[in-house]
Swiss-Prot record:
Its cofactor is K(+). K(+) binds at N226, S245, I247, T250. Residues 216-359 form the TrmE-type G domain. GTP binds at residues 226-231, 245-251, 270-273, 340-342. It is found in: Cytoplasm. Keywords: Cytoplasm, GTP-binding, Hydrolase, Magnesium, Metal-binding, Nucleotide-binding, Potassium, tRNA processing. GO terms for molecular function: GTP binding; GTPase activity; metal ion binding. One of its GO terms (biological process) is tRNA methylation. This is tRNA modification GTPase MnmE. Mg(2+) binds at S230, T251. It comes from Acidiphilium cryptum (strain JF-5). It is an enzyme of class 3 (hydrolase).
Length: 433
């Protein structure tokens, strides 16, 4: 995005056709636009009832005007809101008038981008806003709200302050290398550095769990043909998302459905029955099922009555073993959960077991976390630099590694070196954000 920051931009922040239409404006010429459309500037931060008019159309509408002079505004520049009636004709007329006055429609995320460029929010807060817009479940909302509200930004600021203090101590040790300083001084500095490194490592672990929460936990259902996988998926989803048939090999491709398990987003994936097949399409379905199993966060291994044999699964992926079609009889092994998707028996117990497993997968401890791969990568860079600094005995080289850690922290909040990230972050926003 390469746009002039001085342009007056505008965008609707509400849908068309409602009772009220909210229009946002930002830029150095907002006061001029207000003067042309609504007369004199109102008192800042107070709602004022005005008639909005232009020379060609006369009165366009009557509504509320709010004026926020920069830099004390949401974007850091002059900003206004028009609260008008929500009809399409009103929206079209006010848009035409704004275009006549030289304003232009905002690009996706441009309001938030200007707020970032004017230091009204940092990159972590901007990413939190994007995640809040996309949040589907309560747990995702809480995670995104912590990020958007600056909780992680404050944690990063504390890490930065601690790192700067350590760098100052190291600089003093280098400057006074000829002095007979007590060995305890350097030992205390290294102990503090190790504690900071441990905090960063803990944050990486929390971030990996939070990433799973942000992206959604993938649960893959595996079993032989006719093991009741599709019927089970339909029962858990509460709708018919997969075709059910007594004919083996009916499911030939992975079919996913989104679920909300206790506030955690889940993608439940039905797969082709695992067996050798001369049918090229079915064989490809089996290959894809095995690939999904290797990438899964959790497996449901289905074994149907009467023998309840479950398939082999990747050893590094946790699994629940389910005895499907339990209503048909047979001795269910003690390690398996008996379920009948046809009668509903055992489904509540299965959902409870899934919820417990899913909550354990996204457990990140108390406090906020960094859920995006970019953020976790920055933390890993910080931890790696601190590890190298702790392992080096040469003070000048140790200082270089600590500087590398500081640079990685700065990239985390967008202070430096993130131009390639900005377009990706803000382009995911809606127009009015």
């Amino acid at each position: 995005m390469s746009l002039a920051p001085s342009d007056v931009i505008f965008a609707p922040a509400s849908g068309v056709g409602g009772a009220i239409s909210l229009l946002r404006l930002s830029g150095a010429g907002v006061a001029r636009v207000i003067g042309a459309l609504a007369g004199s500037l109102p008192a800042p931060r107070r709602a004022s009832l005005r008639s909005f008019r232009d020379g060609r159309r006369g009165i366009i509408d009557r509504g509320l005007l709010l004026w926020f002079p920069g830099p004390a505004s949401v974007t850091g520049e002059d900003y206004a809101e028009f609260h008008l009636h929500g009809g399409r004709a009103v929206r079209a007329a006010i848009t035409a008038a704004l275009l006549d006055l030289g304003a232009r429609p905002a690009e996706p995320g441009e309001f938030s981008r200007r707020a970032f460029l004017n230091s009204r929010l940092d990159l972590l807060e901007a990413e939190g806003i994007a995640d809040l817009i996309d949040a589907e479940t309560e747990a995702q909302r809480q995670l995104a709200l912590d990020l958007a509200g600056g909780a992680m930004s404050r944690a990063v600021a504390a890490w930065r302050e601690a790192l700067i203090g350590l760098m100052a101590q190291l600089a003093a040790l280098i400057d006074f290398a000829d002095e007979d300083l007590p060995a305890e001084v350097e030992a205390a500095m290294l102990a503090s550095m190790a504690r900071l490194r441990d905090e960063i490592v803990a944050a990486i672990g929390a971030g990996l769990a939070a990433e799973r929460l942000r992206e959604g936990v993938e649960i893959v259902v595996l079993g032989a043909p006719n093991a009741g996988k599709s019927t089970l998926v339909n029962a858990l989803a509460g709708e018919e998302v997969a075709i059910v048939s007594d004919i083996p090999g009916t499911t030939r491709d992975a079919i996913g459905v989104r679920l909300d398990l206790g506030g955690v987003p889940v993608r439940l994936v039905d797969t082709a029955g695992l067996r050798r097949s001369d049918d090229a399409i079915e064989a490809e379905g089996v290959r894809r099922a095995e690939a999904h199993a290797r990438r899964a966060d959790l497996l449901i291994l289905c074994g149907a009555a009467p023998d309840f044999v479950v398939p082999d699964a990747p050893a590094d992926v946790p699994a629940l073993r389910i005895a499907t079609k339990a209503d048909l009889g047979g001795a269910v092994p003690a390690a398996m959960l008996a379920v009948s998707a046809r009668t509903g028996a055992g489904l509540a117990d299965l959902l409870a077991a899934l919820r417990a497993r899913v909550e354990a997968l996204v457990e990140r401890g108390a406090g906020p976390a960094l859920p995006r791969p970019r953020q976790i990568a920055c933390l890993r860079d910080v931890a790696a630099a601190l590890d190298r600094a702790l392992a080096i005995d040469v003070p000048e080289l140790r200082a270089e590694e600590m500087q590398a850690a500081a640079v990685a922290l700065a990239r985390l909040t967008g202070t430096i070196g993130v131009e390639d990230v900005l377009d990706q972050v803000f382009s995911s926003f809606c127009i009015g954000k």
